[in-house]
Amino acid sequence: MPGPIAVKLRVLREERGLTQKEAAELANVYYRTLIYLESGKRPPYMPTVTKIARAYGVSVEELVEED
């Protein structure tokens, strides 16, 4: 089961009406990286999380904090 960051990434992307490919392009990360992050198959590295947070208009803290 994907971890909390993976779930948040997917939810934020879907709330913005973006496909994984569109979100990856917006965040300037590899498409497969985003797929792996959302599925929990890759650990979230801070530089990548920072790019995605900026693209989604949220803080890094919002992505990494546990609910």
Residue ranges and their predicted role:
Residues 13, 24, 53:
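The alpha-helix within a helix-turn-helix
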Residues 66:
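Short acidic/histidine-centered micro-motifs embedded in hydrophobic/aromatic stretches
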Residues 10, 21, 32, 50, ...:
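Residues within the helices of the helix-turn-helix
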Residues 7, 17-18, 44-47:
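Residue-level signal for the short linker/turn that defines the boundary of a DNA-recognition helix
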Residues 28, 47-62:
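DNA major-groove recognition helix of helix-turn-helix/homeodomain DNA-binding modules
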Residues 14, 28, 39-41:
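Residue-level detection of the helix-turn-helix DNA-binding "recognition helix"
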Residues 18-36:
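Short alpha-helical DNA-recognition segment
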Residues 1-15:
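A short, Lys/Arg-rich alpha-helix, primarily the initiator
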